[in-house]
């Protein structure tokens, strides 16, 4: 019992020795009683102290910052606004330091977080970029100065990739563009020779082989769709080059709209110039007759685009006489012959329909310029001179009964609708039933005398027509020159070459029928480019008669006079005695559309 007591005493004595350090306990109790009063006052006092310290730090920071930037010769004259609030340089400095300094914030793309801490509007789209740029310009140099770092150049920000072409511009422009141009040229050279060889091989198959009808129809459609000056051998290649060079996806990649427009304009301009040069080169070749030459005019492309070309449907193509497509395909590539294409303009009070379908348009070969027929079974010479608008007066034609042409080589065209015309008296003169195959000058003069009686009247331009004839009346024997005569019209006299010097064909301004123009007689209300049409009384008397593929049964000599008036300049007079009836229809109306 004594031992524990001694132990307790020892502990008590030790406790007494240790009591002075533990003496604050009662004071602690007293503090515990007094703490509520001090705790109530401490947050305000501590908050005020912290605010005072922050203000002092902020003030010292701003003073040193402004001083440093002034010494650096980049003074801060005006603090910019960000998010409809003026930037607090102290807050932006503390926010960046809190997120891990400039490099870390830039690497992790945390500038939007810095902007949010500054209290900017949340709808700003350029918040991060603007915050970073303001910090780099106003605060970063001083922060690096405080840390003892050198003023390093700012890290380059990654540019926004607008288009893929930006990668090419980083390197040497010449080194990257030259190989690309060379590759494009090689690719075009590889593509174009194959196409040209295929195009050249298609129109000239072996005589023993029959080309499929589908290929001929496709060639016809392709040649009709491509706008060409002299035929299918001119500009379609240029347009293929244009399309293939521009729409090649691997060439340019994703391009801006402005770059696309510039490239398309350059390519189309170059191709148009090449197309015109090829057209002029082909038109100047001596293959065509010097008398008939396609006039180059600025109106010709417009006329070509406005000219709607129709093709035979597959059913109509199958109804063609047997062997006609074969013989045309066997004819091989022939020189492109000039075909009169243009846009006729009339007086505002007159009506003239645009040019459209003609029997020669039923075949792409004929439209492309193959006017010579194949050698017939009767042993006709292949080297027959190429015919232009027609033959001579002595050559028999398919337009009259006395002709020796017994067959046709193209299918029968459909009849066109004729617009209502002026009323015709019942006692209008009628055409003679038959005509000699080779009429002389006397018959020509008599027809001209008959044709100019009603020339004093104003001729209204009426819609031309095509009448359908029974093909059974014509023989089934094909002949090469017969096709040309059927297509191009009957005998036509020599045409003066001066008629083609203008940009358009002219017509006489008056049809008086006297050796010189009468001074007292008023001229017809036609402009120099107007082509007169059929008179109404002549249209009424022209009945159906045996003819080739629906072409009208007209006297061959009347075409001579009609074409002469079409092709001669407006100043030339009509040297013919006065006549009674006008019976000279114009052949070009067969090529018009209602």
UniProtKB/Swiss-Prot annotation:
The keyword Signal does not apply. There is a cross-link at residues 85, 94 (Glycyl lysine isopeptide (Lys-Gly) (interchain with G-Cter in ubiquitin)). It is found in: Nucleus. Pfam families: ARID (PF01388). Phosphorylated by MAPK14 on serine residues involving a TLR4 signaling pathway upon lipopolysaccharide (LPS) stimulation leading to its ubiquitination and proteasomal degradation. Residues 297-306 have a biased composition (Polar residues). Residues 165-189 have a biased composition (Basic and acidic residues). GO terms for biological process: cellular response to estrogen stimulus; cellular response to lipopolysaccharide; chondrocyte differentiation; innate immune response; negative regulation of DNA-templated transcription; negative regulation of transcription by RNA polymerase II; positive regulation of 3'-UTR-mediated mRNA stabilization; positive regulation of interleukin-17 production. Residues 1-56, 146-223, 281-331, 426-454 are annotated as: Disordered. Residues 55-147 form the ARID domain. Gene3D superfamilies: ARID DNA-binding domain. The modification Phosphoserine is found at residues 23, 256, 289, 438, 463. It comes from the Eukaryota. Keywords: Activator, DNA-binding, Immunity, Innate immunity, Isopeptide bond, Nucleus, Phosphoprotein, Repressor, RNA-binding, Transcription, Transcription regulation, Ubl conjugation. Residues 1-300 are annotated as: Interaction with SOX9. The keyword Protein biosynthesis does not apply. One of its GO terms (molecular function) is transcription factor binding. Interacts with SOX9. Interacts with ESR1. Interacts with RORC. DNA-binding protein that may regulate transcription and act as a repressor by binding to AT-rich stretches in the promoter region of target genes. May positively regulate chondrocyte-specific transcription such as of COL2A1 in collaboration with SOX9 and positively regulate histone H3 acetylation at chondrocyte-specific genes. May stimulate early-stage chondrocyte differentiation and inhibit later stage differention. Can repress ESR1-mediated transcriptional activation; proposed to act as corepressor for selective nuclear hormone receptors. This is AT-rich interactive domain-containing protein 5A. The lineage of its organism: Eukaryota, Metazoa, Chordata, Craniata, Vertebrata.
């Amino acid at each position: 019992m004594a031992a524990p007591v001694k132990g307790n005493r020892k502990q008590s004595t030790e406790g007494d020795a240790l009591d002075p350090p533990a003496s604050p306990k009662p004071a602690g109790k007293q503090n515990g009683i007094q703490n509520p009063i001090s705790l109530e006052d401490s947050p305000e006092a501590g908050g005020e102290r912290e605010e005072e310290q922050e203000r002092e730090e902020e003030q010292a920071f701003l003073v040193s910052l402004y001083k440093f930037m002034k010494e650096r010769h980049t003074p801060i004259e005006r603090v910019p606004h960000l998010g409809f609030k003026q930037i607090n340089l102290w807050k932006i400095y503390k926010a960046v330091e809190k997120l891990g300094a400039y490099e870390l914030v830039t690497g992790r793309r945390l500038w939007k977080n810095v902007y949010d801490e500054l209290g900017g509007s949340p709808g700003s789209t350029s918040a991060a970029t603007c915050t970073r740029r303001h910090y780099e310009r106003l605060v970063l140099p001083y922060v690096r100065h405080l840390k003892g770092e050198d003023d390093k150049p700012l890290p380059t920000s990654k540019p926004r990739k607008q288009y893929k072409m930006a990668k090419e511009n980083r390197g040497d422009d010449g080194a990257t563009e030259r190989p690309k141009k060379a590759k494009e040229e090689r690719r075009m050279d590889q593509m174009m020779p194959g196409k040209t060889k295929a195009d050249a091989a298609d129109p000239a198959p072996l005589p023993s082989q029959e080309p499929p009808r589908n290929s001929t129809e496709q060639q016809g459609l392709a040649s009709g769709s491509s706008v060409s000056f002299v035929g299918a051998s001119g500009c379609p290649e240029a347009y293929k080059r244009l399309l293939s060079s521009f729409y090649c996806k691997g060439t340019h990649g994703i391009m801006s709209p402005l770059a696309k427009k510039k490239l398309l304009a350059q390519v189309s301009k170059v191709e148009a110039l090449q197309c015109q040069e090829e057209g002029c080169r082909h038109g100047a070749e001596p293959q065509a007759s010097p008398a008939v030459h396609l006039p180059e005019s600025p109106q010709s492309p417009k006329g070509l685009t406005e000219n709607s070309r129709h093709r035979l449907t597959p059913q109509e193509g199958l109804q063609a006489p047997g062997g006609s497509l074969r013989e045309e395909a066997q004819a091989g590539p022939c020189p492109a012959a000039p075909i009169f294409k243009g846009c006729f303009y009339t007086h505002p009070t007159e009506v003239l329909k645009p040019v459209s379908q003609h029997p020669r348009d039923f075949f792409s070969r004929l439209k492309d310029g193959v006017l010579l027929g194949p050698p017939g079974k009767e042993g006709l010479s292949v080297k027959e001179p190429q015919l232009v608008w027609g033959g001579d007066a002595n050559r028999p034609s398919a337009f009259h009964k006395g002709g020796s042409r017994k067959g046709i080589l193209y299918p029968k065209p459909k009849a066109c609708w004729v617009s209502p015309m002026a009323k015709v008296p019942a006692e209008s003169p009628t055409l003679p039933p038959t005509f000699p195959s080779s009429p002389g000058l006397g018959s020509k003069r008599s027809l001209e005398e008959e044709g100019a009686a009603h020339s004093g009247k104003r001729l209204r331009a009426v819609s031309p027509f095509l009448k359908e004839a029974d093909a059974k009346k014509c023989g089934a024997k094909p002949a090469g020159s017969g096709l040309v005569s059927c297509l191009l019209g009957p005998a036509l006299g020599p045409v003066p070459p001066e008629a083609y010097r203008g940009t358009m064909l002219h017509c006489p301004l008056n049809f008086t029928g006297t050796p010189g123009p009468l001074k007292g007689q008023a001229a017809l209300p036609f402009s120099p480019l107007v082509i007169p049409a059929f008179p109404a009384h002549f249209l009424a008397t022209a009945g159906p008669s045996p003819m080739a593929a629906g072409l009208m049964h007209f006297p061959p000599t009347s075409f001579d006079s009609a074409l002469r008036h079409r092709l001669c300049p407006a100043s030339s007079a009509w040297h013919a005695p006065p006549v009674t009836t006008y019976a000279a229809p114009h052949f070009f109306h067969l090529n018009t559309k209602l």
